[in-house]
């Protein structure tokens, strides 16, 4: 485990020089996520192979040092380990906080886990879309169903999908 000073230096480094930031050509899912409490926004781009293993991840975002550094650290880890979509879904939020440093994150757990929550939603989107296509659903039917589900399933304190896009420019201080 890293000491507090090393954890802070790691966060600042990832904030100033983010890894895997930008668009991902050919992404299977592009999922925006936001934290209305402080205005953090992260959009995760995910590409997965036909067997459900993550090939690549990138992110776009704006917000506090913790949320943006966490997105960079998470993308870097995923691009090194190439987990399955199920493994992404099972990745514990507590583990993300531990990676960043529990005492460094303090009470900013939503900032620290925004990228992970958004990545999990992207992984779920890929899984659901693939199952629905296998069942013969059209792209329009999938979009309509997804819109209805996203409106009802946002976690308290975090928003995903269209709700995160609507948050852009609302409620957050400039960073």
Which residues does each predicted region cover?
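C-terminal binding/interaction regions
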Residues: 1-25, 30, 76, 84-175
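Flexible, solvent-exposed short loops/turns enriched in glycine
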Residues: 69, 82-85
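Short, thiol/selenol-centered motifs that function as redox-active sites or metal-ligating centers
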Residues: 38, 61-69
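Short connector loops/turns at beta-strand edges and beta->alpha or beta->beta junctions
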Residues: 49-53, 64, 93
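Catalytic-loop motifs flanking and including active-site residues across diverse enzymes
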Residues: 66-71, 111-114
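Solvent-exposed residues in well-ordered beta-strands and their adjoining turns
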Residues: 47-49, 60, 79
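Structured beta-strand/loop patches that form or line metal/cofactor-binding pockets in enzymes
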Residues: 13, 17-56
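Short, small-residue alpha-helix embedded
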Residues: 70-78
């Amino acid at each position: 485990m890293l000491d507090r000073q090393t954890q802070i230096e790691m966060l600042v480094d990832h904030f100033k020089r983010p890894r895997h930031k930008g668009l991902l050509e050919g992404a299977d899912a592009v999922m925006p996520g936001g934290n209305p409490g402080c205005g953090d926004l992260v959009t995760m781009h995910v590409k997965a192979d036909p067997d459900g293993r993550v090939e690549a991840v990138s992110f776009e975002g704006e917000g506090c040092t913790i949320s943006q550094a966490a997105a960079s650290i998470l993308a870097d880890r995923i691009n090194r380990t190439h987990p399955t979509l199920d493994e992404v879904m099972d990745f514990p939020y507590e583990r993300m906080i531990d990676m960043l440093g529990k005492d460094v994150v303090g009470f900013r757990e939503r900032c620290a886990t925004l990228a992970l929550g958004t990545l999990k939603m992207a992984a779920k989107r890929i899984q659901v879309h693939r199952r629905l296509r296998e069942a013969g659903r059209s792209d329009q039917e999938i979009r309509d169903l997804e819109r209805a589900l996203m409106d009802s399933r946002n976690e308290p304190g975090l928003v995903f999908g269209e709700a995160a896009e609507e948050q852009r420019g609302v409620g957050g201080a400039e960073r």
